[in-house]
Amino acid sequence: MVDTKDLINLETSLSNPFGNFGDDFSAQNVVSIDKKLLIDLHQLSLGPVLSEGPYSVVYEGLYKSVPVAIKIIQPDMSANVSPERKQKFQREVTLLAKVKHDNIVKFIGACMEPSLILVTELMRGGTLQKYLWNTRPHCPDLKFSLSFALGISRAMEYLHANGIIHRDLKPSNLLLTEDKTIIKLADFGLAREEAEAEMTTEAGTYRWMAPEMFSIEPIKIGVKKHYNHKVDVYSFSMILWELLTNSTPFKGRSNIVVAYATATKMRPSTETIPSDIEPLLSSCWAEDPAERPEFEQISDFLENILRNVCASSTSSPNIFEPEHSTSKELTNSPAMNCLMDQHVENSKKKNRTSCCCFRSACDNSL
């Protein structure tokens, strides 16, 4: 039974997402970008539109005769771009220019005048979201899904190791190469560098947002909800679930219902999830952020699972290997130790019903 009072509190929170969660935006701050990151507008050529959103349009184009993706912020009203939007653009450019990883889109340059323009490498395979939509109702091959999940985990492992929280991890922000063998993380507009103080602003997209970013209790003015980098782990769990089921989490439900479901411990059904992988999902979407594993642990676990899947098959998927090895010693996490123990047990006895050693999904799973 849904508590009407809880829904009212949630609706107030969702209608004013930035009101009581801290002040990431400040209109008084001057927006500036390192000149080394700026490129000459006259060296850009626009091609066909790749995608269009409420605040930007992405084109295929050329920079010095090299194919690129060109994102223009609010092209129809460039003279009236809000200070908040300019600051978001500055953060995205600054952070994207810092990161260099094989599973993160490559930054090429930016322009400030006459419009805000971000130029990155061109990913001709489109978004993961579009790929999944186009293949429904069929589920991707398990090796394919796991290799993509591993690529995402490696990208997030790199970001967290460098103190960066993405905060908007979802299929539409994951891009594919033309041959669909490599996946890369994009859109750093909501990303932040994790300071000593925890993050306090609600951000992200509701279906992939962690429960600690919602509240079914009224929040007093001046009181802030705190969260840390583990919100990305929760978002990853939803993407992994999508890769394994090719379904949208909480499909057909409004933002307010999704927020209520998440805040009250409801999770998508794991009925069709392979028993070896279900414990990973349950740990990643645990209500308590402290119970969620780090991405380093997730990468190691996925590597082991993928290795076993490939060994039992006659052919192996195209798995992208980064320059550095991720076969690192696992941190001494009780949650991940339990997860690995469960995986070993499942490998020994395939027909045994999987017993999740983390927080179980809500009995009223959606």
What positions do the PLM features span?
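Short beta-strand micro-motifs within the conserved protein kinase catalytic domain, predominantly
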Residues: 106-114
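Activation segment signature within eukaryotic-like protein kinase domains
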Residues: 148-149
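Regulatory alphaC helix of protein kinase catalytic domains
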Residues: 89, 93-94
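A conserved loop-to-beta-strand element in the N-lobe of protein kinase catalytic cores
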Residues: 113-121, 129
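Protein kinase glycine-rich loop
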Residues: 47-54, 58
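Catalytic-loop of the protein kinase fold
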Residues: 160-176
